[in-house]
C-alpha cells in the first residue's frame, strides 16, 4: 500500500509522533492506521506524544560559540529535576552545537546528530525520561567578536539565562561584563533606534496622561514628558542603561572607554512568556486517577 502524505498526517495528528516516525510506522504495518498506532506505542513514541499536552516551562538555555558566530537554544522540561539530569544536559549541549550550522529552528529539528535527527532525539528522550520536553527556540548572533555568558549555570555552557554579545574592537574583558549586565538588567533593545515604535508611543501616551493629571501648564507638561521619556529610554535600552559594574557610566560610555562597539546581543531566559499551569495536589491525583 502506498504511504501518502495524508496518511502520515493523520497518524501524526492521532499520536503526535514525528514525521519520520509516523512514516516508518505506516511502512512497517503496510498502511494499517490502527496497527501503526500500536507500533508507535510499542516503541514508546505514542507514549511520548501523550505527554505533549503537559506544560514544559522549566529546562535550560544552551549556548555555543565558534568562528565569530554564536547561538542560544532553549530546551524545556516540565520540572527542574529533569533539567539537572545529565542525559538532558548532554542533549541540550548537542542541540546547541548543532544549531551553529542550522539556519533556523525548523532546520535544527531536521539536523542529524549521531545518526538521528534532533526531533527524533527529543522524542526518544521524552519516552525514556517520562516528561514532556520541547525545543522551543534558537537565536543566532554573529560579529567580529562574540562573547557568551550563562547565568545560574547548571553545567558548562548552559543555565537559566543565556546571553550573547557581538562586539567590534579588541575585547579586553569588557564583553563578559556587558553580557553579565544584560543578564541582570534585561534591556529591551540595543538602542532607541531598535525599539518598537509602538512601545515608545504607548509609553509616551501614558506619560502624557499622567502629566496632565497634575493640572500644570502645558509648557511644564511638555518638559515633564521629555524628562520622563528620556528616563524610560535609558532604562530599557542597553546603551542607555547605567552599567552594573560602574553605575556612573552608561553601558554605551563604558564600551566606548574600552575601545569597543556593541553591535548586537541576545538574551534568552528559560520559560519567559510561558504560562505555567499550577495544580494543587488533590487536583493532580484526581487527574491521574481519571486517566
UniProtKB/Swiss-Prot annotation:
Pfam families linked to this entry: EF_TS
Principal localisation: cytoplasm
PROSITE patterns noted in UniProt: EF_TS_1, EF_TS_2
Matches recorded under InterPro entries: EF-Ts_dimer_sf, Transl_elong_EFTs/EF1B, Transl_elong_EFTs/EF1B_dimer, Transl_elong_Ts_CS, UBA-like_sf
Single GO cellular component term: cytoplasm
Protein name as it appears in the record: Elongation factor Ts
Spans annotated as Involved in Mg(2+) ion dislocation from EF-Tu: 79-82
Annotated compartments: Cytoplasm
Function: Associates with the EF-Tu.GDP complex and induces the exchange of GDP to GTP. It remains bound to the aminoacyl-tRNA.EF-Tu.GTP complex up to the GTP hydrolysis stage on the ribosome.
Family annotation (SUPFAM superfamilies): Elongation factor Ts (EF-Ts), dimerisation domain, UBA-like
Keyword entries, A-Z: Cytoplasm, Elongation factor, Protein biosynthesis
CDD domains: UBA_EF-Ts
Stated family: Belongs to the EF-Ts family.
GO MF entry, a single one: translation elongation factor activity
Amino acid at each position: 500500500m502506498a504511504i501518502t502524505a495524508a496518511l502520515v498526517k493523520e497518524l501524526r495528528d492521532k499520536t503526535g509522533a514525528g514525521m519520520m516516525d509516523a512514516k516508518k510506522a505506516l511502512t512497517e504495518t503496510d498502511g494499517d492506521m490502527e496497527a501503526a498506532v500500536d507500533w508507535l506505542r510499542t516503541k514508546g513514541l505514542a507514549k511520548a506524544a501523550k505527554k505533549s499536552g503537559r506544560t514544559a516551562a522549566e529546562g535550560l538555555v544552551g549556548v555555543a560559540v565558534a568562528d565569530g558566530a554564536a547561538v542560544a537554544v532553549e530546551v524545556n522540561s516540565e520540572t527542574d529535576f529533569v533539567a539537572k539530569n545529565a542525559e538532558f544536559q548532554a542533549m541540550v549541549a548537542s542541540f546547541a552545537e548543532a544549531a551553529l550550522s542550522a539556519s533556523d529552528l525548523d532546520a535544527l529539528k531536521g539536523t542529524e546528530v549521531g545518526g538521528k535527527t534532533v526531533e527524533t532525539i527529543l522524542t526518544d528522550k521524552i519516552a525514556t525520561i517520562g516528561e514532556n520536553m520541547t525545543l522551543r527556540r534558537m537565536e543566532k548572533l554573529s560579529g567580529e567578536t562574540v562573547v557568551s555568558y550563562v547565568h545560574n549555570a547548571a553545567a558548562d555552557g548552559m543555565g537559566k539565562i543565556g546571553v550573547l554579545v557581538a562586539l567590534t574592537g579588541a575585547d579586553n574583558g569588557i564583553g563578559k561584563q556587558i553580557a553579565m549586565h544584560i543578564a541582570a538588567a534585561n534591556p529591551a533593545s540595543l538602542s532607541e533606534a531598535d525599539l518598537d515604535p509602538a512601545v515608545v508611543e504607548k509609553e509616551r501616551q501614558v506619560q502624557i496622561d499622567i502629566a496632565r493629571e497634575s493640572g500644570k501648564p502645558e509648557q511644564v507638561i511638555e518638559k515633564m514628558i521629555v524628562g520622563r521619556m528620556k528616563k524610560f529610554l535609558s532604562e530599557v535600552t542597553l546603551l542607555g542603561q547605567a552599567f552594573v559594574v560602574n553605575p556612573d557610566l552608561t553601558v554605551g560610555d563604558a564600551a566606548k572607554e574600552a575601545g569597543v562597539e556593541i553591535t548586537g546581543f541576545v538574551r534568552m531566559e528559560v520559560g519567559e512568556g510561558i504560562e505555567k499551569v499550577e495544580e494543587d495536589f488533590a487536583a493532580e491525583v484526581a487527574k491521574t486517577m481519571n486517566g
